[in-house]
Amino acid sequence: MLDVNNFEYMNIGLASPDKIRSWSFGEVKKPETINYRTLKPEKDGLFCERIFGPTKDWECHCGKYKRVRYKGVVCDRCGVEVTRAKVRRERMGHIELAAPVSHIWYFKGIPSRMGLVLDMSPRALEEVIYFASYVVTDPANTPLEKKQLLSEKEYRAYLDKYGNKFQASMGAEAIHKLLQDIDLVKEVDMLKEELKTSQGQRRTRAIKRLEVLEAFRNSGNKPSWMILDVLPVIPPELRPMVQLDGGRFATSDLNDLYRRVINRNNRLKRLLDLGAPSIIVQNEKRMLQEAVDALIDNGRRGRPVTGPGNRPLKSLSHMLKGKQGRFRQNLLGKRVDYSGRSVIVVGPHLKMYQCGLPKEMALELFKPFVMKELVEKGLAHNIKSAKRKIERVQPEVWDVLESVIKEHPVLLNRAPTLHRLGIQAFEPTLVEGRAIRLHPLVCTAYNADFDGDQMAVHVPLSAEAQAEARILMLAAQNILNPKDGKPVVTPSQDMVLGNYYLTLERAGAVGEGMVFKNTDEALLAYQNGYVHLHTRVAVAANSLKNVTFTEEQRSKLLITTVGKLVFNEILPESFPYMNEPTKSNIEEKTPDRFFLEKGADVKAVIAQQPINAPFKKGILGKIIAEIFKRFHITETSKMLDRMKNLGFKYSTKAGITVGVSDIVVLDDKQEILEEAQSKVDNVMKQFRRGLITEEERYERVISIWSAAKDVIQGKLMKSLDELNPIYMMSDSGARGNASNFTQLAGMRGLMANPAGRIIELPIKSSFREGLTVLEYFISTHGARKGLADTALKTADSGYLTRRLVDVAQDVIIRETDCGTDRGILAKPLKEGTETIERLEERLIGRFARKQVKHPETGEVLVNENELIDEDKALEIVEAGIEEVWIRSAFTCNTPHGVCKRCYGRNLATGSDVEVGEAVGIIAAQSIGEPGTQLTMRTFHTGGVAGDDITQGLPRIQELFEARNPKGQATITEIDGTVVEINEVRDKQQEIVVQGAVETRSYTAPYNSRLKVAEGDKITRGQVLTEGSIDPKELLKVTDLTTVQEYLLHEVQKVYRMQGVEIGDKHVEVMVRQMLRKVRVIDAGDTDVLPGTLLDIHQFTEANKKVLLEGNRPATGRPVLLGITKASLETDSFLSAASFQETTRVLTDAAIKGKRDELLGLKENVIIGKLVPAGTGMMKYRKVKPVSNVQPTDDMVPVE
């Protein structure tokens, strides 16, 4: 057997007839499959045992030889070799065709490869191959031309005229003869000459032909192999036939298609032997051609062959194509053993790294381990009795199971797995019942809730797999989100609410101003009802041993609340005492204003101090991030568990519920509504008098009602008591927001109709008062649209992720430093005056390209190639520096991937990225996963041109697919000055730009908004009108860097507007993949063809080679490809074929004799090899473990 891990590369090519015969173990002569009485395969049929091997292990067809001792014997009676039955999965047969037939992929594909080689149109080819016309194969010395088509009538006339001097024939035989006559070298030389002189259409045709002919010449494939003399028959186990319960047979469609070919082939042989008239033979040959076409790609030409019930049969091509094809169904996504699935329920008692596995599930999953352990412990004599013990579920089995699962992590996965946190490892604990218990804090990462979600469990078997699961995938390790480096395991809902309630402060609460010696004393007072959790009290600062106070602070009294004392118990040692929700308190120390000299009047001081806000969800997140930064993983995960327990405990104790009485009705509501109504009446009056247009009237009415709702919302929030449960829920960040509250207690406001236009009649009632029938009806539109949008969005977002993963799957950190001297200039990302992304956010975790100095003192803040961390980034910003040169994936020189320096910090771990990290896939997941949070809508602002800007998911797709954007902006192609702006006819305006050399004029629609005025100085690529730039246009007039930065800026803009943060480096990796190709304009003295697409790396290598010999290099221009196009243009044919357009990719690859170097992840998964990322990289595979223990002297037994 081939060892899959020793593959270097994989080749694909055309098979010669001899090659096909060498694969075969015998010729299939009969269309029979299985004998209906004996149920044994028929001899020489499609399932023949003599050709394909025995159906039963070690047993020949006639039964003369049985048992393994006859291994390798060929039976003298039935001719079957005695061997394993699984050879029926790998042995092929063949059919000798009575007449050559063409391969439909090469004749029918676009462009037709056969047509390009022969320089004939596909139309002409079709006429010849399907016996409609003759083609002249050898004109001899007649006036006919080679490859000329003749109809039946013309052929007869020429035969009468010239006799047998010339040769013309029809069918694939004729094409075969023409293909054999082609001299590749001569043709290529002629075409190269033609290229030098020709223009336009002829030139493009020549380039296309040259590409195909060069491919044949270089790959060693012969053009005549596109015509088949012999047809391979795939192994029978890959097209099985099985008996169903009713005695009927279920069979693969391929068997039907093969049977048609064999029947027609045998009939043709018989007709040829009988010497039948040519018209009958021709008809039979055409039918054979059609049968082979249907077998290879049914439905590609003419009507597809159908089976019972008019269903088209699945041909060989269909077996590979699409989601259900071989690539995506069986090679890239396999079903695995040692897995289970069940409903999840919450496990609040679990530790961060644990999950609860139902007992019976665990027993089934760990069965082999339990059996081994039972035998080792002597509780069973052999494996068989151990198995019996497990099946009978004897009591000792449970004890053994307990010890087996200890420290054996399992993987939990929730579909849809949108990012890498959708699969994490946990240590199992056994639980009763049949549901999996999940830790509440990992729900955010899985996007799981407990309303019936299910999860799958997988068991890592080998020691290496277990080690990887424990070290890399354990839930306690995955605290940061790979997309932005922020903690993903922040408490939510009840936990937030509990901690919020615990840290509330109230003026004048029971026992305010009491002084305590230490925390225990304060808690005792609380338990006995002398103080409340929210009471502000004083505690001796020196009693809080684990907290960092300054020496001065230690000697004083600390003003805090009882709840905050409890909250601070969960924080790690030497962390500042959290007394107010501010950045300085988290990062530096507790502010001095909370400390009193001993003996001061505590009550009086407390009475004067303002109330501090409680700790909301955001603050909890910041505390976690700071703890992670200081104390790393282990301490953070322990602290998270403590925070979770505290939150649950106090949200239970607080007993926060929602009742109708909590929804306070606003008294002023009626007045506000009446005032708004009178404003609307005014507007209507103006409209009726003709003072304003319909459009203006609509706009004003909408804005009046929006303003009224805002006023109500503002007043409502002010009128709420801060202990109102609904207010607490929304303020703490547990659930809900101000808008929900306004709808409950104020008014519902304006709604949109099904078309998305806002209805100008607002819903004046709130849910508390109840809606009228009309109002209820209007509300239903929005609800329905919301549900439909969500469903569509999920599918769109998933498909976007799939394309992103595909284009970047081979981007891996391949080396430490690529040695580039280029970088990008990082500035804050701005949209107008608003900053989308601050400079420090762009700098953190990146390597500096150039030294950064303080502009005033000249002090070096960061050296070249030094990592910029949070502190350094802050120093740079505080020094007033506005732009910094940093290393970037855009400018990295590593051929297939990125280097450590250009990538920077790994956001998921907060430390340097390792060589072998699959950063491309992480980037794709980071961009795709928030896709579902983006909106679907295109904003329409009442038909103002240039304002219908696409946003949300459609805009992201538009950018990554490099499509022409909606509402496209006009850009200038020259540097210069705007000299005039004129109105021209047809509602257009003309902008005239005068440059140093030439003057250009641009027209824009009359109502589009201009971004320039007369007299403005402008540079190439600058926008003249509002809207989105077409990046392809931008690439034509500016350089690569401008386009890269534009795409980065636009993608970040969409996500940040929706409140989603994504690290720049992820977008950079994707944009880099879109700009990897160069279109060759002039080949110079290199071997590349003009007009071809080449990888930047291959292009520079080819030029380097030519320059070293002192010749002329090729010139090219960078090309921007959309992600789908870029995926299909990848060097790996396996990756491209498994993505989309499978047959086109494979046709092309076979002709070129492509070689897949197996550099990406997909290719290796397909052939079943370890992926070249992480520990699968060759660098790590070659590491040999060496014992570092010194050998000791021989042990001496102690007497």
UniProtKB/Swiss-Prot annotation:
One annotated Gene Ontology cellular component of this protein: DNA-directed RNA polymerase complex
UniProt binding sites for Zn(2+) 2: C818, C892, C899, C902
Pfam families documented for this protein: RNA_pol_Rpb1_1, RNA_pol_Rpb1_2, RNA_pol_Rpb1_3, RNA_pol_Rpb1_4, RNA_pol_Rpb1_5
Domain of life: Bacteria
Entry note: cofactor: Binds 1 Mg(2+) ion per subunit. Binds 2 Zn(2+) ions per subunit.
Cofactor: Mg(2+); Zn(2+)
Keywords: Antibiotic resistance, DNA-directed RNA polymerase, Magnesium, Metal-binding, Nucleotidyltransferase, Transcription, Transferase, Zinc
Residues binding Zn(2+) 1, per UniProt: C60, C62, C75, C78
EC category: transferase
Gene3D superfamilies the record matches: 1.10.132.30, 1.10.150.390, 1.10.1790.20, 1.10.40.90, 2.40.40.20, 2.40.50.100, RNA polymerase II, clamp domain, RNA polymerase Rpb1, domain 3
Protein EC: 2.7.7.6
Binding partners and assembly: RNAP is composed of a core of 2 alpha, a beta and a beta' subunit. The core is associated with a delta subunit, and at least one of epsilon or omega. When a sigma factor is associated with the core the holoenzyme is formed, which can initiate transcription.
UniProt family annotation: Belongs to the RNA polymerase beta' chain family.
Function summary: DNA-dependent RNA polymerase catalyzes the transcription of DNA into RNA using the four ribonucleoside triphosphates as substrates.
Alphabetized HAMAP family for the sequence: RNApol_bact_RpoC
Name of this protein: DNA-directed RNA polymerase subunit beta'
Organism: Bacillus subtilis (strain 168)
